[in-house]
Structures are given as C-alpha cells and as structure tokens.
Amino acid sequence: MTSQVSSILSRISSPTDLKNLSLAELSLLAEQMRHKIISVLTNTGGHLASNLGIIEVTIALHYVFSSTEDKFIFDVGHQAYPHKLLTGRNTEEFDRIRHDGGLSGFTSPSESMHDLFFSGHAGNALSLALGMAKATEDSRTHILPILGDAAFSCGLTLEALNNISSNLSKFIVILNDNNMSISQNVGVMSKNLSRWIHHPKFSLFSRKIEKWLTKIPRYGNGISKRSHKLSTCLKSLFCPIPIFEQFNLAYMGPVDGHNIKRLISVFQTARDLPFPVLIHICTTKGKGLEIAQENPEKYHGVTANFNSSEKNKLLPTIKPQLTYPDVFGQTVCKLGETSPNLHIVTPAMSLGSRLEAFKEKFPKRFIDVGIAEGHAVTFSAGIAKAKSPVICSIYSTFLHRALDNVFHDVCLQGLPVILAIDRAGLAYGDGCSHHGIYDISFLRAMPNMIICQPRSAIVLQQLLQSSLQWNMPSAIRYPNIAAIQRDPIATDVNMHRDPGLGEILSQGEDILIIGLGHMCNTALSIKLQLLTHGISATVVDPVFIKPFDNNLFSILLMHHSKVIIIEEHSIRGGLASEFNDFLATYGFKVDVLHFGIPDAFFSHGDKESLLKRVGLDTESMVKRILTHFNFRTKTSPSNKLSIV
C-alpha cells in the first residue's frame, strides 16, 4: 500500500471531501478502504464479505448525494463499514469495531448524524424509507433505501413494494445484488440493449407518451394501457426484473457495482428523475479478497485473530471446543438417521446454525426459506400437520419477527413444531439489535408451549431427542458459546426428559441458587465462592421454564427462605417471572434476589465487560448476595455438600 493511497483516506473527514477527488483518486480510495477493512477485521472480526463488495457503491452515493440532507437507509446495516469510513469515523474507534470502546458493527444514530436508524434486522429499510418519503414529499430531500438482494425474500419488503406510489419523487431504491441470485445478464448484445431500454430518458419519454395518450377522447385510456403493456413486454425481453415496473418503480440496470464512473453517472441521472426509481447494482461479495470471493457465505462474518497473510488467504481461528450450535448440528444429523421423516427448516441461517452437514446428508429434508422468519415458522407448522417431525432452527433475535406465526399457526393449532432457538443470551459484538434476551417473555404467555434450556452439551442432546416424543409445541434455547462438556449428573445421552422436571446439582443449607441453562455453571462457581464465607448453597437447574417444576421447588422452599435466580435473559418475563408466579400461586414467602439483564438496551462489547455491565459477572453477583442477605462469614462451612 503506497503512501499516496494511504494519504487519500486520511484526507476524508466527511463525505464533502470526496467532491475534490478525481476518478483515479476515487478508485485508489476504494483500494485503500478495502485494505483498511481487511486489516481491521483481522484483529476484531466482523462482517467482511458484504462490506468489501459495497465500497464503490458507497463512494459513489456519497459523491452524488449528501447523507446529511438526503436520507441513506441501510437495510440490515452490517454493510455500513465503508459508510462509516467516509463519514468521519476513520478513527481508533473503527479499529476496535464491535469491541469495547469501538464502533458498532451496524448503523447507529448515537455514533453519527449520518446514521438514521439503529439497524441489525433485514427487510425494514423500504418501509422506513417510504414513511420518510411521505413525510418529506414536498422537500428537496432524496430518500435512498439500500437493500441487498436477500431482503427481497422478506415479506416486509414485499409489503412495502406494494405501497409505493408513482407520485413519489426523489425516491431511489438501491438494490445491491451481490449474489446474482435475481438475474444473470448474458452477452454483449443483452448488456447494450439493457442499457438502452432502461436508460432513464427512455423511461421518462415512455411515461410522457402514456400521459399524453390518456388525453385522447374516448379511446385515450385504452390506448395508454396497451402502450404500457407493449413497453413492458419490450422491456421484459431484456430486463432481468420487469416486476419492479409493476410496483411503480422505474428500473435502471444492471449496473456494474465496481465501476465508480458508471455508478456516479447513473446516480446523477436518477437524482433528477421526477418519479421513483430502482437501480439494480451487481457487486461481488468479498471483492478484493480471493478466498472471500470464492466462499462469500463462509466469509460473510469472520472471527477475530484470523491470519490475513499468505496471499490474502484467511485462516479462521480453530475453536478449542464445540459450541452449543456445533452440538445442535451434530445431534440433528444423528436424529436425521434415526427419524427418516425429520425435516429441518431455517430462515437463511444454515451456516451459523451449523446445519451444513444435515443439508448435505439429507438435502430433501432441509429447507432454507431465506430471510422469512414468519414463513419459516408457519411452513414448519404445515410439515407438522402432515405428521412429519420438524425442527425450525432460528436465532432468538429473529424469532421476534415470527411472534404471530408461533401463536396462531403453532400454539393455537397445538402442532409439535420444535423451535431450536439459537443465539439465546447476549450477542456481545453484534450489540443491542441481536441480543437474544426476550424470547422467554413472549413464549411464556402462549398456551401449549414448552420452553427449556440445556446447561450442557449432553442435556442439549437429551432435549432434542426427547422433544420428538413430546407431541407439543416446544422451544429449546441455547447460546452461541462453548458448550459445557462435563456433566456428572447427566451422563446418558439417550435419557428421555419429560417436560417440567428440574434437577438438583448440589445440596446445601443456607441458600437456594437457581441457574438457567449455561448459568448453572456460574451458579456452581458462586457456590464455591460462598463456601469461603461459610455459606452453603443448593444449586438447581430447572431445565424447563415452562412447565415449571412446581413439585421440586415446593419441596426446596420448605427448607430455603433465601433464593437467588440467575439468567442471561431480560429481567422482564423470564425465569424469575415464572418463579414469582409460582410463589404467588402456592403462597410461599421467600426473599428472592434476581440476576438478569436490566430493562434497557445494551450496546456491543467484549464478553467479560458486557457481563460486568449488566451485573452478571461472578464477582459482582457474590458482592450483591453477601450484601442483600446480610450474610456474616461463618467459622466453618457446612460439610453437607455435594458439588458436581
């Protein structure tokens, strides 16, 4: 990387600085930004391939439009790294992106006036943009939603398309087609004809002709309609996506998303059109990094501390042990062999949910529906209705989008759909839009729903196998962290688990600690620390949040008046809420100390610091326990303990 290239990015403190650059300098800037993103993500991890693919598009957008006067609305927002570099955030905070003291991995209004919305979920940009366009239709503001091709599998995007009015001006949809999944443009003749037939002057001329034809007495409307159909048919010969014309969007494209000169020209033309436009831009995901271009899905997101040397080949860090998603992926593969009708459904998360092996082994029973969470759940309900076992694998944060589908199509029908809720708990680097800390609260309220969480790898295996026999709607939630392998209590992988039965992990006399899922390990660590103060604790894993083990806890509360609940979930509506309902129903009067995620939004951060921020680190909890219960150190701990 030359000093000339390095000096270009250092001169960019705001998008207005782009106006003074030549086309050659803009191309060098793109090269430098690519190098910067690769270099930073080598240390921090983050979304790689999508950001490498949208650099030239971002440069051209900021060159032609103003992100302070015009409105850039990024769908998902994980592809906004180049946007951050051009809007005054090429700082030390960018070098720590997704980590403590660093920038968010998504757009964030708290960071910059150039970011309009907190983002993280797909498919909402077009709806947000239409709302803004309606409120600003008499102004000079251009509204620019920027969507990837995958967003068009979202029902919300299609609903927004249906709501577009031809009267909107200064409304420009940017379609970043980085997979060529929508269309393939073949041959020089097709390219040249497409450029001519979709030239904005052709669209403008065509609309003027149609408007003039409607003024002909008696026959005007009919002639105009036939003229429009003829125009549409002509376009359909060369246009990869004639459907957009039916939604009042003039189509422009395909456009080479890595040709800055062409992009600037197209954006300048679209800027001056008096009707809504969709610009179809074709980009290469992972552009500039060979291995990411060859496998863009694998390098969509990368972990920290990978090696970017050796001819640009990235070598992801080898994980020391299996994560809960790894265990899930291995288990469903085994279940696929023993349950020949088992289907797995996922909304575009096959790689993250470790379903590639099942997909390869049982391709006819694996269904990736795209970014369509509601459809994934209802589709699964249809499979269950047809008497086939089905697991719908879905991230906790994305399950929010399928709430009505879970209620109406699964629980109300009493169908045995198994929700495998991945990424339950804090999302750390991905931040507030991705924390999986709300699902228990809305699932608890649904009749017929079983909710459980494993504390270890073997319990996850047991729950997955057992859920196929429950014949009821169920949710098995688990985090994306290293799975606890050693579990002396649970030793038989094939042990069947009936809903509503918890387990005592360790017996004590002074206090009862209830840990949810992987927090049982934290509970056992706290138990050991309390022992140094002469305090003995019983540690219990409820396993099931719903149905709750009323019998077990009724017996335990006959011997314990002090209770601690630890869960990596919102304090509203989680395990503690279920426990409080139990207390109210059975009339127990006990002192309860609850550790959960406070009722607020928490941004990204490293695991240790984020746990400390929400009060779920062991040191903070022990201090609160000693203070809350006013424990005084005993001379010697109880010897009636059985630590497992």
UniProtKB/Swiss-Prot annotation:
Reactions catalysed: D-glyceraldehyde 3-phosphate + pyruvate + H(+) = 1-deoxy-D-xylulose 5-phosphate + CO2
What metabolic or biological pathway is this protein involved in? Metabolic intermediate biosynthesis; 1-deoxy-D-xylulose 5-phosphate biosynthesis; 1-deoxy-D-xylulose 5-phosphate from D-glyceraldehyde 3-phosphate and pyruvate: step 1/1
What SUPFAM superfamilies does the entry give?
Answer: Thiamin diphosphate-binding fold (THDP-binding), TK C-terminal domain-like
Under Pfam families, the record lists: DXP_synthase_N (PF13292), Transket_pyr (PF02779), Transketolase_C (PF02780)
- Quote the InterPro entries the UniProt record gives: Dxylulose-5-P_synthase, THDP-binding, Transketo_C/PFOR_II, Transketolase-like_Pyr-bd, Transketolase_C, Transketolase_CS
**Would you kindly state one Gene Ontology biological process term found in this protein's UniProt entry?**
thiamine biosynthetic process
One GO cellular component from the entry?
cytosol
Enzyme Commission code(s) on record = 2.2.1.7
State where thiamine diphosphate binds. H78, G120, H121, A122, A150, A151, N178, E373
Note accompanying the cofactor annotation: Binds 1 Mg(2+) ion per subunit.
Binding site residues for Mg(2+): D149, N178
Q: Which domain of life is it from?
A: Bacteria
> Which UniProt keywords are listed?
Isoprene biosynthesis, Magnesium, Metal-binding, Thiamine biosynthesis, Thiamine pyrophosphate, Transferase
MF terms per GO, please? Answer: 1-deoxy-D-xylulose-5-phosphate synthase activity; magnesium ion binding; thiamine pyrophosphate binding
UniProt cofactor(s): Mg(2+); thiamine diphosphate
Q: Main role?
A: Catalyzes the acyloin condensation reaction between C atoms 2 and 3 of pyruvate and glyceraldehyde 3-phosphate to yield 1-deoxy-D-xylulose-5-phosphate (DXP).
UniProt cross-references to HAMAP family, sorted A to Z: DXP_synth
Q: Which NCBIfam families match?
A: dxs (TIGR00204), PRK05444.2-2 (NF003933)
The family line of this record is: Belongs to the transketolase family. DXPS subfamily.
Q: How does it assemble?
A: Homodimer.
Please identify the protein, giving its name as recorded.
Answer: 1-deoxy-D-xylulose-5-phosphate synthase
Q: Which gene encodes it?
A: dxs
